[in-house]
Amino acid sequence: MHNSSELIAVINGFRNSGRFCDINIVINDERINAHRLMLSGASEYFSILFSSDFIDSNDYEVNLSHLDYQSVNDLIDYIYGIPLSLTNDNVKYILSTADFLQIGSAITECEKYILKNLCSRNCIDFYIYADKYNNKKIESASFNTILRNILRLINDENFKYLTEESMIKILSDDMLNIKNEDFAPLILIKWLESTQQPCTVELLRCLRISLLSPQVIKSLYSHRLVSSIYECITFLNNIAFLDESFPRYHSIELISIGISNSHDKISINCYNRKKNTWEMISSRRYRCSFAVAVLDNIIYMMGGYDQSPYRSSKVIAYNTCTNSWIYDIPELKYPRSNCGGVADDEYIYCIGGIRDQDSSLISSIDRWKPSKPYWQTYAKMREPKCDMGVAMLNGLIYVIGGIVKGDTCTDALESLSEDGWMKHQRLPIKMSNMSTIVHAGKIYISGGYNNSSAVNGPSNLVLSYNPIYDEWTKLSSLNIPRINPALWSAHNKLYVGGGISNDQTTTSETYDKEKDCWTLDNGHVLPRNYIMYKCEPIKHKYPLEKIQYTNDFLKCLESFIDS
């Protein structure tokens, strides 16, 4: 006898011939011979049963008629060294039986099989099973598979077996794999129709209402399983008062704009979530110190330097929907660099900067509306400046800090509306060259230079401004001081990356609001020799947004699933 497997094979031969068997497992009219010692060694259930008062030592039978005979037989064969023959049809029965009998190795083998074979064809079935038997490992994996394949599953025959509680969980999840929030109501309606269950307010609350198109909101209003419920109509009548929703993880693309370390090109990179890497999707001739603004998923780059010693008045753009460059855009009124860029729903604004002729600071704010033939002067700042932070919030253009006359930083904060300029609470410290983002109704700034007099080294400061209370709050500092970093908001989180810190940095950081701390983010590491200049979350757009509302709009929406 050379090893344990040979010994087990011999004992199995004894079992098959009935030698030394001291227990019979009875399931209805079927009997399975076995040895107590073998069963006790593999099964916690049998170990307790045979070593306690549950069964008399002289009893020769154990009745397990409440279990599936074939599963028990397969598991006893497994105890005697015969491998489990698992299929999608039998694995659930074997797993639940192994769980009852507490055969740990068989449970692990079944779980591995299910996890390996999970797909869109069986994930709902396994999710319902795991929920019933409280198997958290399989439940989590199958739920994530449902999220990834949700738009395939809305026509699956098992879709109707999901409970309302499960649908609330699915529709609430940030990782729901839809590239436009309009698909979430489609998922809800398909489930309501398959179950013929009336809608509830709890289900409607799972939708990111503020992100829905008017056509889809009308479709919800008019659907019989929604419109027949008074509470649902009341909820929809009050959606104007709901807080702004954050887009789901898959409904935006992260697009970064940067320049190569070798100073030979502008690079447009897209974040690949599956690989956790940034991938270059396009590039063009080098330019730096330009302003960036995004309107209708088109990234505009204004002014700056190219490889000549002169500042540029040219404006170029990158269309993220068509992955193409746009060059036929009217030039700025005059060449400038180190300016700020923002956009509202109609216009792109180019703010301040440095003039080409005499390197003097600029106070003018020019704007351009796509399809118009030229830029117009919109307003002038109270003080000429460059390298300031700019943000658009609640219809106001905020100008934050910057470099003013004498090459010094300023702590001024002002906003521009149709009624003119308004002063606000000054920055806690004079700053310039910081990154700026609007997030959750506040303005956040990070990095740059900060100094009470002349401009000097990089900063790791992070501040937030609350426009309601007109106050600044100092947050936890960055791990790495950065000049002109990219600051972006995605999935209700803040990120900072790139910029210059003594040398160019490829690192990024994530902000934990609850702990008030920044952590280095290994998931958004930038390519080598790449200076991230700006990062913009781009919301996916679909041709359906141009389609007029009809009674069968949701059916029309369904046709865009694979687009």
From Swiss-Prot:
A Pfam family recorded for this sequence: BACK
Task: Please explain the role this protein plays, according to its UniProt record.
Answer: Probable substrate-specific adapter of CUL3-containing E3 ubiquitin-protein ligases which mediate the ubiquitination and subsequent proteasomal degradation of host target proteins.
| Location in the cell | Host cytoplasm
Tell me a GO biological process for this protein: symbiont-mediated perturbation of host ubiquitin-like protein modification
Is Kinase included in the keywords of this UniProt record?
no
Subunit-level organization: Interacts (via BTB domain) with host CUL3.
For the BACK domain, which residue ranges apply?
123-219
Q: Which InterPro entries match?
A: BACK (IPR011705), BTB/POZ_dom (IPR000210), Kelch-typ_b-propeller (IPR015915), Kelch_1 (IPR006652), SKP1/BTB/POZ_sf (IPR011333), Vaccinia_A55R (IPR024182)
- Notes on the domains: The BTB domain is responsible for the interaction with CUL3 while the Kelch repeat domains supposely serve to recruit the cellular substrates.
Top-rank taxon, per record: Viruses
Its GO CC terms? host cell cytoplasm
User: Under which name does UniProt file this protein?
Assistant: Kelch repeat and BTB domain-containing protein 1
Q: What are the start and end residues of each Kelch repeat?
A: 252-297, 298-346, 347-395, 397-441, 442-492, 494-538
The chain positions of domain BTB read: 21-88
Q: Which PROSITE patterns match?
A: BTB
What UniProt keywords apply to this chain's record, in alphabetical order?
Answer: Host cytoplasm, Host-virus interaction, Kelch repeat, Modulation of host E3 ubiquitin ligases by virus, Modulation of host ubiquitin pathway by virus, Repeat, Ubl conjugation pathway
**Entry-linked Gene3D superfamilies:** 1.25.40.420, Kelch-type beta propeller, Potassium Channel Kv1.1, Chain A
Keyword hit for Transport: no
